[in-house]
Amino acid sequence: MPAISIRGTEMPASPIRKLAPLADAAKQRGVHVFHLNIGQPDLPTPQVASDAIRNIDRKVLEYSPSAGYRSYREKLVGYYDKFNIKLTADDIIITSGGSEAVLFSFLACLNPGDEIIVPEPAYANYMAFAISAGAKIRTIATTIEEGFSLPKVEKFEELINERTRAILICNPNNPTGYLYTRREMNQIRDLVKKYDLFLFSDEVYREFIYTGSPYISACHLEGIEDNVVLIDSVSKRYSECGIRIGALITKNAEIRSAVMKFCQARLSPPLIGQIAAEASLDADEDYLRDTYDEYVERRKCLIDGLNRIPGVYSPIPMGAFYTVAKLPVDDSDKFCAWCLSDFEYEGQTVFMAPASGFYTTPGSGRNEVRIAYVLKKEDLTRALFVLSKALEAYPGRVE
């Protein structure tokens, strides 16, 4: 048998999903698993979206335009205007989820061997998309002790060389929940301008900012309009992960032209998903307000509960619906697997994502986990209690 590709062997396993077989086995044993590992909201999808799908009246479910339906893109212009992001429909390309938007950004803007600077910990699939594009991720460390704030500009400049082509940020951040300040965004702008880099900005969690601090989009940064590629998705905003609808947004016509070639090669974004996503823009204002309020309460429940467990520490996330917590364990990969394979308390256990998978620096995140607060408060409270019992019983606990 011929050998599989180097790309295939180097592709990292998802830290979010790699333990799923252990979770499935636990369920088969009758154990209830609290899923804290994945950002799958449990809140209902807007009724207008479900109704739009239910009422589809088409004789043919045809290919949609490769850039997405213009009616949807025109409605998105109004959505972004609410955040003072001024666009035209031509600036927006609809993608099969935010993931495809990231991949197409890399494919359109980077050559094999080009480097992207990414603050770590970072969303694990960025590495997978970089490998797919033949690019290289260079990470700049942020720490839990400093709340995952950005390091000084000099740390970025230490990484910049002739192969550096882009900086990638996620704001608010997955996995940390950190929200970049105006000073930090201006720092990134200045680097992009000074070294003529692309700025890829993943902003899918803009609705979920809990501190009263302003949301500063990469599109708000003056002087680098042609350098910015904005990544977006409806998955988290409307609890629509399964319809796979995202967007790639840029004012740079040359980037859009290159991206469109990849869009045409994959033919079209999902027709039914676009119907649901367009309808979601008409959701009652109470929908997003109630969703926001629910996550505010869940955040408080989770962070207060984590920091009451002996030996556990979590900073207070400012956005998204994740936190990275430090645990008193020797190895979070082993601990998370042990929770699923060897531990249960009163027929229950917890499924978390080991944070090491969100780092590229060897050894980083070894005693950290990412936790998503996408369960109702009653379940979060119980999951935290089960976690505390797991930490008491774990053979590799450290003080």
Residue ranges: model-predicted function:
Residues 59:
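Basic nucleic-acid-binding alpha-helical/helix-turn surface characteristic of O6-alkylguanine DNA
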Residues 1-4, 8-14, 19-56, 86-399:
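PLP-dependent class I/II
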Residues 63-96:
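Conserved N-terminal alpha-helix of the aminotransferase class I/II PLP-enzyme fold
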